[in-house]
Amino acid sequence: MAEDGINSYMTGPDEQGRFGIFGGRFVSETLMPLILDLEARYEHAKTDPDFWAEMDDLWKNYVGRPSPLYFAPRLTEHLGGAKIYLKRDELNHTGAHKINNVLGQIILARRMGKTRIIAETGAGQHGVATATVCAKFGLKCVVYMGAHDVERQAPNVFRMRLLGAEVVPVTSGRGTLKDAMNDALRDWVTNVRDTFYCIGTVAGPHPYPAMVRDFQSIIGREVRWQLAEQEEGRLPDTLVAAIGGGSNAMGLFHPFLDDPSVRIVGVEAGGKGVDDRMEHCASLTGGRPGVLHGNRTYLLQDADGQILEGFSISAGLDYPGIGPEHAWLHDTGRAEYVSITDAEALEAFQLCCALEGIIPALEPSHALAHVIKIAPTLPRDHIIVMNMCGRGDKDIFTVAKHLGFDMKI
């Protein structure tokens, strides 16, 4: 581990919010004062014991952290190779990792005197988490969600409305996460005085990528001590996590970036296959650098620089970009990024249900599909830790449709 910080992977971003050539702060003049105020408030909060005391209390008593690190015995035996551990963040309150970050941002919003919270959501988990925390603190909540995602994630739409949130279906573009984020940014520009934008992933203008990463890093910090307890002080050999924007992955990866023995693998949504048809959301595998939603990163785009829609069975991975820190880790070679198709994710989903009695969300099913590929090729003392970042209740209708199961029976 780099202790002097000179050769550390954990010191970014710089003062301009850049990770190498990625990141930054590409926003309108209207938003810049709010962004700078948010950065100042967060920098102060990072060193404020009262802020972290409140976070720790809510993580423990409201979210239910620490989430378990579970050895998957039947999956390990079935694959016949590496030992597989699942970080059970789907057991958090609201059913995913998203609430880890939402709590931090909304505590900051309250400190800034904001009374209205807006958010974007794809799979609906960030929207549910935001609506949940707003209900707890008595704040107005508006969630932008692509119309296509509203249809395929109906259970989460109902949950958000039960929690008091206004859900705004976005019909522009293909009606997915990118379009929801576009409309949320338009709302923010119009209502800067009383509104706080709670971004759900490690994207957006600085300080969001670093701030969301810091809140999600509770995942990796827990894994360090939990695995040490279960495996006599060992570190994981390989970390695997699914990536849309990349917050659950960054939360798992970041505490291990300066441990060179730990292999780090991010799994993107390969959709119908990563080829010239661009029916996928694998930004690092099939994209190139550009600017979207306030930061420079790898994006799916055409020859003229127009952002492409992408495709994935998973609403939470259906995003044509990726967090800038992931782009930097990709280019430096510290992390590797692969893609998994819809069909492979569906197979992994079913195997996890059958062998471990865990119904995963389609997002971590992509990560699990990669684990299924690599585990048999690794020795039995090799330890893989995969982040089970969400539960699959929200996806049962989508999976049933693809498997040809009639839900009306």
From Swiss-Prot:
HAMAP family: Trp_synth_beta. SUPFAM superfamilies: Tryptophan synthase beta subunit-like PLP-dependent enzymes. The beta subunit is responsible for the synthesis of L-tryptophan from indole and L-serine. This is Tryptophan synthase beta chain. Belongs to the TrpB family. Its EC number is 4.2.1.20. GO terms for molecular function: tryptophan synthase activity. Its cofactor is pyridoxal 5'-phosphate. Pathway: Amino-acid biosynthesis; L-tryptophan biosynthesis; L-tryptophan from chorismate: step 5/5. The gene is trpB. GO terms for cellular component: cytoplasm. It is an enzyme of class 4 (lyase). The keyword Amino-acid biosynthesis applies. Signal peptide: none annotated.
